[in-house]
Structures are given as structure tokens and as C-alpha cells.
From Swiss-Prot:
GO terms for molecular function: hydrolase activity, hydrolyzing O-glycosyl compounds; polysaccharide binding; xyloglucan:xyloglucosyl transferase activity. Residues 1-24 form the signal peptide. This is Putative xyloglucan endotransglucosylase/hydrolase protein 1. May catalyze xyloglucan endohydrolysis (XEH) and/or endotransglycosylation (XET). Cleaves and religates xyloglucan polymers, an essential constituent of the primary cell wall, and thereby participates in cell wall construction of growing tissues. Residues 27-225 form the GH16 domain. The lineage of its organism: Eukaryota, Viridiplantae, Streptophyta, Embryophyta, Tracheophyta. It comes from Arabidopsis thaliana (Mouse-ear cress).
Length: 295
């Protein structure tokens, strides 16, 4: 075994170790068997009805994108805090221009939003882009190359949103943290948001800056989803109740990453993140104010 092979194997084992060691608190306390929660319990199809297929008695949903339409669904409820997760298997092979999205969003021009977006690619790994909008302002993109092929099998993607922080997880590993720094004069998502999932045509920007278009001869493109339970505080709850520590995701242990989560997060940033708006000196001569708190 040469040195490069050894380092490659060592790096892979290190990632596995961190995945095993990372504190999966958010997955343990929920206590609900995901396999028993059906699509219709929490979600409704919102567009592209002809491109939505319910499988396994509603325990799995397949979205399709063809030349006529993409498709999507959203949660029946609006939330003001919570832990939201879903299992996704994205379309395989050449998916240039195809976007698979899982996100939280409010409505209107001054909306809040927290995004997972899988940006299609030619043969090979696709990029995962995350973004955070506050009062209609985004431009907070980060991109990473996952340590697995998300088209081969289902993986779990989750968003923790509480009064302290927003954390995006991939298979229990934190891949993004956005802290509540309103005390420092910054904005933080606070509007009631729905969970939205979609498969759509993003060829004008998603791959190579829009240079690589969708190869429609490969359509339809199909993405599959499982695990439709949400742990969230409904908007119609008593005023200010959604920030209460009576909800497990608002307790002090979720006010910051655990030590093991922090180690895993640092590993992701060092090895897998290939774009961070906070480091983009072309777009931002001075890093946005929130960067010093979130990095």
C-alpha cells in the first residue's frame, strides 16, 4: 500500500468514526417510528400532481421532472420552531440543471427560508447547496461535496430551528450552523414557515453557472422521499410558546453543538466544503456581519 492509498483509507475511516461518534440527540428524543408516519399525515401535493407517485401505502413518495413540469409538496402546517427531517434519494447519473430541494420557507417578499438544494451534475458527485434567507435577503450560500453518492440510497437530511440556532444535518452530521445573533443587530428567521420539497428545472443557474443544461432525452428524472414526521411547534400555538423549553428542541442542550458534533462539523468544513459565501472576496469585499459568529 502506497502513502496516498493509506491516507485515502485513513481519511475515510476518520469520517466513519465521526459519524458513529457524533451526538445524534435530535434523532433519539423524537421517539416516533418514522416508518409509521405516512405522507398524507403531514403533507399535501402542491404542484405537478401528474408527476407525484405515492408508494408503499404512502410511506414513500416519488417526484418526477419531465419537459412539461416538475413537482412538489409542502407541509399542511406552519411552524415557528422545530426539528424537521426527511429521507431523500436524488435522481442518478447525468442530472445537469436538475434541482432537488428540501427547505423551510415563509411567504411574501420579506420571507425567511432555510434551504437544502441538491444541484444536479454530469456524471459524478453533485453539489449540495445550503442557504439562509432573512426578511427576503439570501446570498448566504455554502456548498459541499458529500462523502457518499446521494443517488445510490436514502440518506437523512434535517433542519433544527430554535431560538438559539439553525443547524442543518446530513445523516446526523452537522453541515451548517446559523446562530441567532439578533442581540448583535443581525436578522434571524422568525416568521412562520412550512416544510417544502420539490424537484424542478434549475438549468439557468444550477450546474456550471447555467452552462450545462438539462438533457431531456434522459427524462423523466425521479427523486424519492421517505420519513414524513415533523417535530414542530404550530403557528397557531399560544403567543411566544414556540420558543418554550417545554419543546425538546428548545432546551439548553440544543443551544449549541455538542463536543462530538462540533468535531464532526469542523471535519466537514475542512474536508468537504468547497464554497462559503463568507470567504468570497469577489462578492463581498468585507465579509457579511454574521460570518464571524457562524464560522
Amino acid at each position: 500500500m502506497n502513502k496516498m492509498e493509506y491516507l485515502s483509507i485513513f481519511g475515510f475511516v476518520s469520517v466513519l468514526y465521526l459519524i458513529i461518534r457524533v451526538d445524534a440527540r435530535a434523532y433519539e428524543v423524537n421517539g416516533i417510528d418514522q416508518s409509521k408516519v405516512g405522507f398524507d399525515d403531514n403533507y399535501v401535493v402542491t404542484w405537478g400532481q401528474n408527476n407525484v407517485l405515492k408508494l408503499n401505502q404512502g410511506k414513500e413518495v416519488q417526484l418526477s421532472l419531465d419537459h412539461s413540469s416538475g413537482s412538489g409538496f409542502e407541509s399542511k402546517n406552519h411552524y415557528e420552531s422545530g426539528f424537521f427531517q426527511i429521507r431523500i434519494k436524488v435522481p442518478p447519473k447525468d442530472t445537469s440543471g436538475v434541482v432537488t430541494a428540501f427547505y423551510l420557507t415563509s411567504k411574501g417578499n420579506t420571507h425567511d427560508e432555510v434551504d437544502f438544494e441538491f444541484l444536479g451534475n454530469k456524471e459524478g458527485k453533485l453539489a449540495v447547496q445550503t442557504n439562509v434567507f432573512t426578511n427576503g435577503k439570501g446570498n448566504r450560500e455554502q456548498k459541499l461535496a458529500l462523502w457518499f453518492d446521494p443517488s445510490k440510497d436514502f440518506h437523512t437530511y434535517a433542519i433544527l430551528w430554535n431560538p438559539y440556532q439553525i443547524v442543518l444535518y446530513v445523516d446526523n452530521i452537522p453541515v451548517r450552523v446559523f446562530k441567532n445573533t439578533t442581540s448583535q443587530g443581525m436578522n434571524y428567521p422568525s416568521k412562520p414557515m412550512q416544510v417544502v420539497v420539490s424537484l424542478w428545472n434549475g438549468e439557468n443557474w444550477a450546474t456550471d453557472g447555467g452552462k450545462s443544461k438539462i438533457n431531456w432525452s434522459l427524462a423523466p428524472f425521479k427523486a424519492n422521499f421517505q420519513g414524513f414526521n415533523n417535530s414542530g411547534c404550530f403557528t397557531n400555538a399560544e403567543k411566544n410558546a414556540c420558543g418554550s423549553s417545554a419543546y425538546w428542541w428548545n432546551t439548553g442542550s440544543y443551544s449549541k453543538l455538542s463536543d462530538s458534533e462540533q468535531k464532526a462539523y469542523t471535519n466537514v468544513r475542512q474536508k468537504y466544503m468547497n464554497y462559503d459565501y463568507c470567504s468570497d472576496k469577489v462578492r463581498f469585499h468585507v465579509p457579511p456581519s454574521e460570518c464571524k459568529w457562524n464560522n
